[in-house]
């Protein structure tokens, strides 16, 4: 391959966005492989915390993959956050964002202490890390699991570590409410201890997962 061809190939790979659906499929497979032998996955999907679910205080926050962020990681990711902030203050982008969030409920997105089931799930979704990763929500016959799958530095492929982050017994999951009035893919999960937390299921394909939850509620239904 010529130097020009090599440069073009590298540039093309750099600007080509990742195949998100393929990335999710691989992350789900890697996450499922981490479960105890004999525990069968009913369904799963990548998951993110609701936007206004708070970061856990220091005693409840963990270092993802057992690695404390380095100064170099913080500099690189800080640059990405600056770029994102500049993008958001662009008047055109701000108008689009406001339209997308029209009618959004600005109230709290969780309830319960950090030691509650909802608190443990929320903390698992907000670890301390500068690495790129996906959180995978797996529902099995035994419980609900959150597994973190590390991605490559460009976020385009699964690479590196996989770790179990949280588990809740299936009998402790009492309801799930669809909050499509907030954002398509947003759901509230309620637990037997009275706690609940908002999560976001990105991309499509999560319908079969939510069908497995007990007592599914619409956004027009009152909070249990």
Regions found by a protein language model. Name each.
Residues 2-137:
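Anionic N-terminal interaction surfaces
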Residues 2-41, 45-46, 162-224:
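Low-complexity intrinsically disordered segments
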Residues 82-196, 203-208:
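Phosphoinositide-binding peripheral membrane targeting modules
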């Amino acid at each position: 391959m010529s130097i020009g061809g090599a440069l073009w190939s590298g540039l093309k790979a750099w600007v080509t966005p990742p195949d998100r659906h393929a990335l999710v499929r691989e992350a789900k497979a890697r996450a499922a492989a981490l479960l105890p032998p004999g525990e069968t996955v009913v369904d799963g999907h990548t998951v993110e915390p609701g936007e206004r679910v708070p970061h856990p205080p220091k005693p409840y926050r963990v270092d993802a993959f057992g690695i404390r962020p380095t100064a170099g990681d913080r500099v690189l990711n800080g640059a990405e956050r600056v770029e994102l902030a500049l993008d958001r203050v662009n008047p055109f982008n701000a108008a689009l964002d406001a339209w997308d969030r029209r009618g959004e409920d600005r109230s709290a997105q969780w309830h319960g202490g950090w030691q509650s089931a909802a608190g443990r799930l929320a903390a698992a979704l907000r670890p301390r890390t500068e690495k790129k990763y996906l959180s995978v929500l797996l529902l099995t016959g035994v419980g609900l699991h959150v597994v973190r799958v590390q991605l490559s530095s460009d976020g385009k492929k699964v690479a590196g570590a996989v770790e179990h982050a949280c588990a809740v017994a299936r009998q402790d999951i009492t309801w799930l409410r669809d909050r499509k009035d907030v954002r398509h893919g947003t759901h509230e999960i309620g637990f037997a201890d009275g706690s609940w937390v908002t999560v976001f299921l990105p991309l499509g394909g999560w319908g079969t997962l939510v069908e497995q939850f007990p007592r599914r509620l619409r956004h027009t239904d009152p909070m249990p």
